[in-house]
Amino acid sequence: ADKKDSDVLLFLDGYDTFLTDSLEEISYRFTGYSERIIFSSERFCWPDERLSTELRKRNENQKTPYQYLNSGMYMGRIGDLKKLFASPISNDADDQLYVQLQYLTGEHSMELDVEGYTFITHEPQAVKYKGQLYNPLTNCFSCAYHGNGGESAKTKLASLYNDFYGLTYIPTKRYEILSDDILLIDFMSEDMCR
């Protein structure tokens, strides 16, 4: 409630994304887009391949393989995002399909990051180069990575994450089961687990 409609919100999927640059750099890059909401993009049209032709037509830059909206990383002004997500999405609905359909209406100021200027979705050739996330297919240095996809995507995600941050592991010697879906680990308080 303390956020204004003019504030910028950055959304990243929780378990298969990580940042490779600062929030300041991401915010700076956001100001360079002509549209008010920016979504990551990917190679494959999922979950409904029948939308592929329509989705491709919406992109000015057709030169990259990343032509399809991916809802795993996006940013925009809060007021614009409120309008985009004004219609409720049921728990069993696909949020990516919802956003793709909203994008196709043309009613929202939305753009796909087809060059990976800010966001890169799973790309086997992406590497850490001179301390930054680099996509040789687009010659862009990006700010965030999303390892969306199957086992090979998760392997690439882990490899890139390790290149940027090294293996991070906090050894846990004991834990307490608080409920079916909550564990209390010795370096966390009970309040942190609720």
Predicted regions and their residues:
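Glycine/proline-rich, flexible active-site/cofactor-binding loop segments
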Residues: 1-5, 29-31, 194
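Short hydrophobic/aromatic segments of transmembrane alpha-helices and their interfaces
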Residues: 2, 64-65
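Short, high-confidence coil segments that cap the C-terminus of an alpha-helix
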Residues: 4-6, 33-36, 140-142
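Short aromatic/hydrophobic "clamp" motif used to bind/position activated sugar donors
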Residues: 9
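Short acidic donor-binding/metal-coordinating loop in glycosyltransferase active sites
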Residues: 14-16
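Conserved donor-nucleotide/metal-binding helix-loop-beta segment in metal-dependent transferases, i.e.
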Residues: 18-61
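Catalytic core and acceptor-binding pocket of nucleotide-sugar-dependent glycosyltransferases
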Residues: 66-183, 188
